[in-house]
Amino acid sequence: MNLLYRKTKLEWRQHKEEEAKRSSSKEVAPAGSAGPAAGQGPGVRVRDIASLRRSLRMGFMTMPASQEHTPHPCRSAMAPRSLSCHSVGSMDSVGGGPGGASGGLTEDSSTRRPPAKPRRHPSTKLSMVGPGSGAETPPSKKAGSQKPTPEGRESSRKVPPQKPRRSPNTQLSVSFDESCPPGPSPRGGNLPLQRLTRGSRVAGDPDVGAQEEPVYIEMVGDVFRGGGRSGGGLAGPPLGGGGPTPPAGADSDSEESEAIYEEMKYPLPEEAGEGRANGPPPLTATSPPQQPHALPPHAHRRPASALPSRRDGTPTKTTPCEIPPPFPNLLQHRPPLLAFPQAKSASRTPGDGVSRLPVLCHSKEPAGSTPAPQVPARERETPPPPPPPPAANLLLLGPSGRARSHSTPLPPQGSGQPRGERELPNSHSMICPKAAGAPAAPPAPAALLPGPPKDKAVSYTMVYSAVKVTTHSVLPAGPPLGAGEPKTEKEISVLHGMLCTSSRPPVPGKTSPHGGAMGAAAGVLHHRGCLASPHSLPDPTVGPLTPLWTYPATAAGLKRPPAYESLKAGGVLNKGCGVGAPSPMVKIQLQEQGTDGGAFASISCAHVIASAGTPEEEEEEVGAATFGAGWALQRKVLYGGRKAKELDKVEDGARAWNGSAEGPGKVEREDRGPGTSGIPVRSQGAEGLLARIHHGDRGGSRTALPIPCQTFPACHRNGDFTGGYRLGRSASTSGVRQVVLHTPRPCSQPRDALSQPHPALPLPLPLPPQPARERDGKLLEVIERKRCVCKEIKARHRPDRGLCKQESMPILPSWRRGPEPRKSGTPPCRRQHTVLWDTAI
């Protein structure tokens, strides 16, 4: 700005000097006019000063312009003002009196500017060129060569239209061509033809160019307007109406392209076939059969409405409809996308929702609704439960895979039967009764194939999580499903109560310990993932929540158990039967190895039940599966290896496992022994408890304390079990009496002492003993609850064992502290944690 100011000042001084010279010369020349000349000179100077000041005042906005133009056009006082006003020529001409030279300069500048404007216009707008050129340059050219110029304009304009012609997908370009030509009458002759061909698509014969345009336009029109071609009505008229053969070819091409789109868009083979005589309809037909089951209501309904509109409706109407339909249809065709529509609308239809997933996963079972009566029934019931998608995801990824849509899990299902089984879980075969009934058939395949058991476990996990409350109804169905050993049936019923379908995987797991264990582990992880998905809590929490819910529902302690489960998410997940997914594995262990149940029970009733194979293998597998599960993985991993070792030790006396849903638990109690309540009150052999205590395993501590503490979560928290304790709490609500029996003393007593009674309990815990023990457990529970309440109050007073720590890392704290530290200072906050978890959930 300073430089500009200085420059302008210098220029102004120069102007001043020049003006003074001129004025002096004028004064000398005309003596008579000396007065006026003198007056004029001062006036000019004043004007210059005023203009300069004004430009400076303007904020130098005009200064640059003045600098640029002032030297060249004129150095008169008007230069700055004229430049600022953008009317140098007029201003100069007005004030050009001072010097003729300035007048000449202004004229030059004016001549320069007008041509510049026309030059600019021609480049920007063709229409402007005509008037500008006519006015400015050559009226003769305009008048004489109006025809040539219009032709040139036409050619130039025709070129842009050609581009649109090249792109048959651009309607606007076509409309532009139509709209633009009207302005220039010279093109009128061709335009009518083009318009006729374009608008009616019937008149394209007159000119080859017109025909070509119609062809392109027809393609465009068919694609956009005549999307109805897929309908077939539009395609017919354009082809028939369009006299030009090229348009027909274009139409056929467009039809082919549209056929592809239609296939994607219209799942209905019939409508697609009708709409099109081309081969694409068969593809549509083939794909729709696979998908119709998946999305029969939506896909078929949509296609029906869309197709009629496309066929009968105007092309423009069809176009908007066509674009949207393909996407839904594509979703149908593509399983991943199907998940959203499926789950809500299609899944709600009994067979459809389930069939979608199965259909997507395997077109082999396009009759997703019919693939297996069991599946449809389950699916019908299952559609409501949202957990299934998580289950499917869990099948693939475990807890992390929750987000996966059904389509993702389905591909992994791979095997036809497993798919069917998975379909049930995916379709949310949550309802335990149906799930239990349907799984009965799958169990054999699951037993046959280790992979299928996993799927089953996962699917059942889904069912289990979905059926948190419905587990009670499932319990009756569970025993029939567990057609294997009576224990299996009982355990299945218990697990069904807790996990609904989870119990089945144990049966297959029994058939193939390793495969079953693997499946059980996967199921556990999936279960947890499913549960976690329903409850925002981590997968481990979710898993236990479901089982906890199950037996709490049985014991009418539903609300609390979830909280306990969430607390257990850290460690109780595995402990309580509430660990729906793990329970299949643990159940298997309990069923096959009473000791396994006892030892593993400490980890979780679900685990004990679920692990049918060698406890170690299954436990390890469970741990591995839990790895994917997140929290549950951590706990199970920690517990898995240790528990597996402990299970071997506890196998002898582990049978007395106290964790089972109360209602189903009673049935399983005989099998498990002391597993009176869904809470994994693990009445483990003294060995199992001691081993766990020695291992410092959270699961071990749970095993020892869980029996007493599970029933009374507070005591268990005070004691070894944090998670088991919570489960005990929920179990106490749900009637985990077995744990209560052992609980009061387990809290006070070392785990070893507790573990010893457990082995005895498992044996005496047949159904008859269980009720008595339950009664005792109730009394013990009351006592334990009081103790726990006191401890909790104390713990609350202690900020170190506040809920925050437990909430954030329920598992890690137990690991860090180890069973013994908890014994010494069982943090009553565990219960608080449960409450917090409930709120979090």
Curated annotation (Swiss-Prot):
Segments of this protein annotated with the region Disordered: 1-45, 64-448, 655-679, 745-769, 812-833
Gly residues bias: start-end ranges: 94-103, 224-243
Biased composition (Polar residues): 167-176
Ranges of biased composition (kind: Basic residues): 114-123
UniProt keyword Iron, yes or no: no
Amino acid composition bias (Acidic residues), ranges on this chain: 252-261
Biased composition (Pro residues): 279-295, 759-769
Record's compositionally biased regions (Low complexity): 26-39
InterPro entries in the cross-refs: NYAP1/NYAP2, NYAP_C, NYAP_N
Involved in CYFIP1- and NCKAP1-binding: region residues: 76-186
Biased composition (Basic and acidic residues): 8-25
Record's protein name: Neuronal tyrosine-phosphorylated phosphoinositide-3-kinase adapter 1
Organism, as annotated: Homo sapiens (Human)
Taxonomic lineage from the root: Eukaryota, Metazoa, Chordata, Craniata, Vertebrata
Gene (UniProt): NYAP1
